């Protein structure tokens, strides 16, 4: 009877070790997946920042420069007026 209890205790210990190792692996996987999801979200936010902020500002800058060049091309020359 004593030997059966010893084998049962060893079996429970091994099963406990296996459960502990599996739990640690799952915890590590969850942490790694959370880190990768956070990294991916940061990359997406940077892309959205590029789309919403950088691209429109470059567009506005280029259009403003085009209008400025067009205005300088079509404006009449300054007339010399004698001081009165």
From Swiss-Prot:
One of its GO terms (biological process) is disruption of cellular anatomical structure in another organism. GO terms for cellular component: host cell Golgi membrane; membrane. Residues 40-80 are intravirion. PROSITE patterns: COV_E (PS51926). Pfam families: CoV_E. It is found in: Host Golgi apparatus membrane. It is a single-pass type III membrane protein. InterPro entries: E_protein_bCoV, E_protein_CoV. Its main location: host cell. Residues 1-18 are virion surface. The keyword Transmembrane helix applies. The chain crosses the membrane at residues 19-39. Keywords: Apoptosis, Host Golgi apparatus, Host membrane, Membrane, Transmembrane, Transmembrane helix. Belongs to the betacoronaviruses E protein family. Plays a central role in virus morphogenesis and assembly. Acts as a viroporin and self-assembles in host membranes forming pentameric protein-lipid pores that allow ion transport. Also plays a role in the induction of apoptosis. Homopentamer. Interacts with membrane protein M in the budding compartment of the host cell, which is located between endoplasmic reticulum and the Golgi complex. Interacts with Nucleoprotein. This is Envelope small membrane protein. The lineage of its organism: Viruses, Riboviria, Orthornavirae, Pisuviricota, Pisoniviricetes.
